[in-house]
């Protein structure tokens, strides 16, 4: 049930990409993301898993993942935070968020691929494809290390570290918006 809201959200992917051009919009989304990540640490934790989690809670977590089409919003962080608010065990919520993250990335690849096909493959060369394949492989290896680090950080400190990072980045983006 978590994947259901994510797939339709990516039909809005092309519409929301223009928000990334506005530093003010990005800084506001980063402030919102920091709040989404920070607030759940003050709520009681639960121990729900697949046996006790309702479909509504799964849909709510999926809506958090669907919010990742907005620049500055972390889909995985939003899913885990919403799951935590609903009483889902953080570790279980993180594992599900990672699984849904694969669907999110697949939808992104499909949308970007459709954009390339609509453009008529102009400028696509073998060296460009090879570069993208190597970059994809390197990002896969980096993601594996990142997942292990993320699991350890969430288990020990929740998402408060990432919330402060988002707020600092939001202030920096807001400052750049004022200067530009």
Predicted features along the sequence, with ranges:
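Multi-pass membrane proteins that catalyze or facilitate reactions on polyprenyl-/lipid-phosphate substrates
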Residues: 1-180
């Amino acid at each position: 049930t978590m994947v259901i809201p994510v797939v339709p959200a990516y039909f809005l992917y092309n519409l929301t990409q223009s928000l990334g051009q506005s530093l003010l919009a990005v800084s506001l989304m980063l402030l919102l993301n920091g709040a989404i990540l920070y607030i759940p640490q003050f709520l009681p934790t639960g121990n729900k898993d697949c046996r006790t989690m309702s479909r509504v809670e799964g849909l709510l977590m999926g809506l958090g993942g669907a919010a990742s089409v907005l620049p500055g919003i972390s889909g995985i962080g939003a899913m885990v935070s919403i799951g935590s608010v609903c009483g889902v065990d953080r570790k279980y919520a993180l594992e599900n968020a990672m699984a849904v993250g694969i669907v999110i990335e697949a939808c992104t690849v499909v949308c970007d691929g459709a954009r390339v096909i609509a453009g008529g493959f102009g400028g696509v060369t073998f060296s460009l494809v090879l570069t993208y394949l190597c970059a994809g492989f390197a990002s896969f290896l980096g993601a594996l290390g990142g997942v292990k680090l993320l699991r350890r950080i969430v288990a020990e400190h929740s998402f408060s570290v990432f919330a402060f990072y988002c707020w600092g980045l939001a202030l920096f983006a807001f400052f750049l918006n004022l200067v530009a």
